[in-house]
């Protein structure tokens, strides 16, 4: 039975355009794979704390003592055990909301999500075959040749390499804040893309 982890970083909740895309993707995915179990990690509910000095000190002490089964590392264990990862986050300030970065710092734990071999080379320890990143952007960065300014998907794709996740796919609907465009039609096209991607996995 495949475990699918859905990381919800859509700060605006059900009003979020990104979340609408993610919900449609997951709905179709579940219909295509009824035997798979989808677990949602809502970062707005979880309220993970940033790595303040006292939190980092506790984490370092637990890790040094080999207590990787401690509740502090539960998010990392959940992430590492999932067979598929779906992350939904809007495009904010050229990447994504801070709550997602805080989560990524929480799950990036040596000997859980990644490690090192005898040569000192980094090796991924996650089970996931692929990661799907779903996002919406107000501007049309790809169309304008400004892909280099986009740091969210690029960062997550790099982390896939670190975690040992073999395939990264990004579903991004762009230009949604451009009043010259038909935003409703663009969202509808994005929902269709989400359905197609869900059926292809």
Residue ranges and their predicted role:
Residues 9, 136, 173:
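Cofactor-binding loop segments of dinucleotide-utilizing enzymes, especially the Rossmann-like FAD-
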């Amino acid at each position: 039975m495949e475990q699918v982890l859905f990381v919800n970083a859509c700060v605006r909740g059900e009003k979020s355009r990104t979340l609408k895309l993610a919900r449609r993707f997951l709905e179709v995915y579940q219909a295509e794979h009824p035997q798979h179990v989808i677990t949602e990690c809502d970062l707005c509910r979880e309220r993970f704390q940033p790595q303040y000095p006292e939190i980092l000190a506790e984490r370092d002490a637990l890790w040094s003592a080999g207590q990787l089964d401690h509740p502090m590392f539960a998010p990392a264990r959940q992430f590492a055990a999932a067979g598929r990862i779906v992350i939904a986050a809007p495009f904010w300030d050229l990447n994504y909301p801070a709550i997602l970065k805080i989560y990524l710092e929480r799950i990036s734990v040596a000997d859980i999500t990644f490690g090192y071999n005898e040569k000192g080379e980094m090796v991924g320890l996650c089970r996931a075959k692929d990661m799907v990143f779903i996002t919406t952007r107000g501007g049309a960065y790809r169309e304008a040749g400004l892909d280099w300014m986009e740091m969210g998907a690029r960062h997550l794709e790099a982390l896939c390499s670190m975690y040992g996740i073999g395939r990264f796919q990004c579903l991004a609907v762009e230009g949604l804040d451009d009043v010259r465009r038909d935003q409703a039609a663009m969202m509808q096209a994005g929902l269709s893309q989400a359905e197609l991607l869900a059926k292809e996995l």
